[in-house]
Structure formats: C-alpha cells, structure tokens
C-alpha cells in the first residue's frame, strides 16, 4: 500500500482570464508557501495565458497546465493545440475529457484516451475527467457510467506519476449542487477499485480529485473523505483567496 497520497488542488479557469488576471495568479503564488508544504497546487488557465503564467510562476510552488490538447503532435488541425505545444509553453499537466468537452464537442472515451496518450508522449500528467449526468444518477447508473468511462478513457500503462483522475458529476458543475458525502465516497471507491484492478500498486497511488461546486464552505468536509486526494476547482479558482482557502482545507 502507498503512504499518504499528497493532495493536489487544481484550478480550471475555463474560458476566463485576460492578462490582468495574472494578478490573481501572482497572489496564489505568493500565498502558496506554507500550503505547498503539504499540498500540490496547479492552475490551468486558458491557452493564451499558459506561457506568461508559467513564466510568472518560475521559482514558485504553483504548476501550470492546459485545459485540453489534440491527440496529434502537429498537423492541419485549425484552432487546436497539441500536448507538445503545451509543454513547450511551460505546462506540466493537461485536463482531458472534461464534461464540457465531452458534451459540447462530442468527445468520446476513445478520443479522451488518445488525448491522454498524447499528454504522456509530451511528458505531461494527464488529468482524466469522468462523471455521470443527473439522469444517469437518478437511474442508479452512476457507478456503471464512471466505470465505463474509466475503461475507455484511461490508457494502458497508467502510473501514479502520469495520471490523475477527476470525478466531476456533470449535474454539479457550476450549478451550486453537490452530491452527498456518501455519494462522493462511493464513486471514488469505484474509481480506486477500477484503477487498482488494472494497474495494481500504481493504481493505488493515483490521485483522485473531486470537482463540481467545490468551494471554501464545503471543502474541508469533502477533502476529508476516503479516496479524495484533492479537488478540481472551477469558479472558485479565479480568486486567489478562495483557491488558497480550499487548499488550506486539505487534511
């Protein structure tokens, strides 16, 4: 069994942030000193800010990541960005399979899997997102759906050092709604069982994040749950004070 898994608090800025927003990032970097002793911190800004964000965070305790990548390293893919480009700009992580990508862009598990493989090819850590819809949860299919997404989206060869899995129930993202603590624990147990079944000891050490209306008010309760090794934060990551408060709540 692995020792205590070091938590990761990751901020997904989504399609938010101009150059002026780097001030919030600087505030996160300034406030990260003590928190970093026990928690890893990551901000995933829009692609336009990755290079200046990474440059600004040199020497700090805050990593920078991308929000998506193309499966190919280069080519005629207008508007897309490759994992190699993200790495070249200073990113060390990339989110793949976020529900907004799956829903708005029709990304399948196979597409997400290819993107995770691309992340590894470029030396990035892949944050693979999974989660059920409200209808799927109401039908009692949440565990089944998440298990299927894991099987299809996480490539073979996953290791604790190159994979993070984020559970984000689709119905909780940006709605203010949150599953019960029992619901979160049950799905995180399903994820852990899936990963250890496939990857043995490596699967035991993969960090499992919870995302979906995670905020300072509920962070301590959620982050203390079994198999919850951090959070993927949306709106609350846009303000340094909120992001750092969530990080401080890690046990």
UniProtKB/Swiss-Prot annotation:
It catalyses: D-glyceraldehyde 3-phosphate = dihydroxyacetone phosphate. Gene3D superfamilies: Aldolase class I. GO terms for cellular component: cytosol. Homodimer. The active site is at residues 98, 168. GO terms for molecular function: triose-phosphate isomerase activity. Its EC number is 5.3.1.1. Pathway: Carbohydrate biosynthesis; gluconeogenesis; Carbohydrate degradation; glycolysis; D-glyceraldehyde 3-phosphate from glycerone phosphate: step 1/1. PROSITE patterns: TIM_1, TIM_2. It comes from Afipia carboxidovorans (strain ATCC 49405 / DSM 1227 / KCTC 32145 / OM5) (Oligotropha carboxidovorans). CDD domains: TIM. PANTHER family: TRIOSEPHOSPHATE ISOMERASE. This is Triosephosphate isomerase. Signal peptide: none annotated.
